[in-house]
């Protein structure tokens, strides 16, 4: 098997040979979707939804555990409900920030 068949080569525009085919410029695909970016609009909408709907039962339990200083237990509860340790840590930090803001008022 030749190396020309395994890796792509630049087309020459010639009808025969290894480099046969129409010569085109390779496009670079740019991603427009950013997973972690939250816009002002989305943040405002989420705040309104949170204000209307409140917290889910597991979030209330995590909040109570954090208030009593049981961070590790709160992480375990969040991990069990959300499925991954990373999601659990993020949720624990979010609820801790909400508790901090509520106590500052």
Swiss-Prot record:
Disordered: annotated segments: 86-105
Transmembrane parts of this sequence: none
InterPro entries in alphabetical order: Ribosomal_eL36, Ribosomal_eL36_sf
Keywords: Ribonucleoprotein, Ribosomal protein
Name used for this protein in its record: Large ribosomal subunit protein eL36
Single biological process term from Gene Ontology: cytoplasmic translation
Family membership noted in the UniProt record: Belongs to the eukaryotic ribosomal protein eL36 family.
Highest taxon in the source lineage: Eukaryota
GO cellular component, one term: cytosolic large ribosomal subunit
Organism, scientific name: Dictyostelium discoideum (Social amoeba)
Gene3D superfamilies: 60S ribosomal protein L36
Any GO MF annotation of the entry: structural constituent of ribosome
Pfam families membership: Ribosomal_L36e (PF01158)
Signal peptide: none
């Amino acid at each position: 098997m030749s190396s020309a068949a395994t890796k792509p080569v630049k087309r020459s525009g010639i009808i025969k040979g290894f480099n046969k085919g129409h010569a085109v410029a390779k496009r670079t695909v740019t991603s427009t979707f950013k997973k972690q970016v939250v816009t002002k609009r989305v943040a405002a909408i989420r705040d309104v939804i949170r204000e209307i709907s409140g917290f889910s039962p597991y979030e209330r339990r995590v909040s109570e555990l954090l208030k009593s200083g049981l961070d590790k237990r709160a992480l375990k509860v969040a991990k069990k409900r959300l499925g991954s340790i990373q999601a659990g840590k993020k949720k624990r930090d979010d609820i801790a920030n909400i508790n901090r803001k509520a106590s500052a008022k």
